């Protein structure tokens, strides 16, 4: 089986949640948010090692979460950078030399399912890169000056990116090297890989695979967990 390293991004703050604490350690139904996706990664036979990237001050707390999950697959807990892109770059440095594939997942997406992780990994093996994503359903407006609508975009063919995102290791390493050299900035890893011309497969994501960003997301997360019981 090809060796796969999974990087879990857990270095964010909770400013939009109205909190300064790292949101991935906020409790959801009595467990830290990070614990949910970590448990899926630990249980997956397709994941060989896990790298968690978090804020330097949160490394002790992250170790507690890892210990609570009995996560023997966790190879390293790495101090992240100022931005998400910087954090993933640090995580890549800790990936095992044997790794042929790298998956990246947001720790603030606690509802990752084994099925979504598996199908994204398998799709990447066919094309070299794959990401979970959902077709855009809402009408998309482009804003202009003073909050006036500048244009209505055709949503046909538009997808909203999620994680996990899975790549050939050398593709992702190349993309991050180019980004560092040329000053590229992106809000997801696929955008950097795309800039090098590599094909990225869209894998239908899941509506429940939400990213916890706002207080409303926390309410929705609680409802989703209550519905699972």
Swiss-Prot record:
Feature type site, description Positions MEP for the nucleophilic attack: 155, 211
Gene3D superfamilies: Spore Coat Polysaccharide Biosynthesis Protein SpsA, Chain A
Pathway the protein contributes to: Isoprenoid biosynthesis; isopentenyl diphosphate biosynthesis via DXP pathway; isopentenyl diphosphate from 1-deoxy-D-xylulose 5-phosphate: step 2/6
InterPro entries: IspD, IspD/TarI, IspD/TarI_cytidylyltransf_bact, Nucleotide-diphossugar_trans
Catalytic activity annotation: 2-C-methyl-D-erythritol 4-phosphate + CTP + H(+) = 4-CDP-2-C-methyl-D-erythritol + diphosphate
UniProt keyword Nucleotidyltransferase present: yes
Site (Transition state stabilizer): 16, 23
BP term (GO), one: isopentenyl diphosphate biosynthetic process, methylerythritol 4-phosphate pathway
Coiled-coil region list: none
A GO molecular-function descriptor: 2-C-methyl-D-erythritol 4-phosphate cytidylyltransferase activity
A Pfam family that the UniProt record links to this protein: IspD
Keywords of this entry: Isoprene biosynthesis, Nucleotidyltransferase, Transferase
EC identifiers of the protein: 2.7.7.60
Presence of keyword Chaperone: no
Function: Catalyzes the formation of 4-diphosphocytidyl-2-C-methyl-D-erythritol from CTP and 2-C-methyl-D-erythritol 4-phosphate (MEP).
PANTHER family, A to Z: 2-C-METHYL-D-ERYTHRITOL 4-PHOSPHATE CYTIDYLYLTRANSFERASE, CHLOROPLASTIC
Protein family membership: Belongs to the IspD/TarI cytidylyltransferase family. IspD subfamily.
Protein name per UniProt: 2-C-methyl-D-erythritol 4-phosphate cytidylyltransferase
Source organism per UniProt: Moorella thermoacetica (strain ATCC 39073 / JCM 9320)
């Amino acid at each position: 089986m090809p060796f796969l390293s999974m990087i879990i991004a857990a270095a964010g703050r909770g400013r939009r949640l109205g909190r300064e604490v790292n949101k991935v350690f906020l409790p959801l139904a009595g467990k830290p948010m990070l614990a949910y996706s970590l448990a899926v990664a630990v249980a997956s036979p397709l994941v060989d090692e896990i790298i968690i990237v978090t804020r330097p001050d949160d490394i002790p707390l992250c170790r507690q979460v890892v210990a609570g999950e009995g996560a023997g697959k966790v190879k390293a807990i790495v101090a992240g950078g100022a931005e998400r892109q910087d954090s993933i770059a640090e995580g890549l440095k800790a990936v095992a030399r044997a790794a042929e594939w790298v998956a990246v997942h947001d720790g603030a997406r606690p509802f990752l399912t084994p099925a979504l992780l598996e199908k994204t990994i398998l799709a990447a093996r066919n094309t070299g890169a794959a990401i979970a994503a959902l077709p855009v359903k809402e009408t998309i407006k482009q804003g202009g000056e003073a909050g006036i609508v500048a244009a209505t975009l055709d949503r046909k063919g538009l997808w909203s990116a999620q994680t996990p995102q899975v790549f050939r290791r050398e593709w992702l390493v190349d993309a991050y090297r180019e980004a560092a050299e040329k000053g590229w900035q992106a809000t997801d890893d696929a955008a950097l890989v795309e800039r090098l011309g590599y094909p990225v497969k869209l894998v239908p994501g899941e509506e429940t695979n939400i990213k916890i960003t706002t207080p409303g997301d926390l309410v929705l997360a609680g409802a989703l967990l209550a519905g699972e019981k």
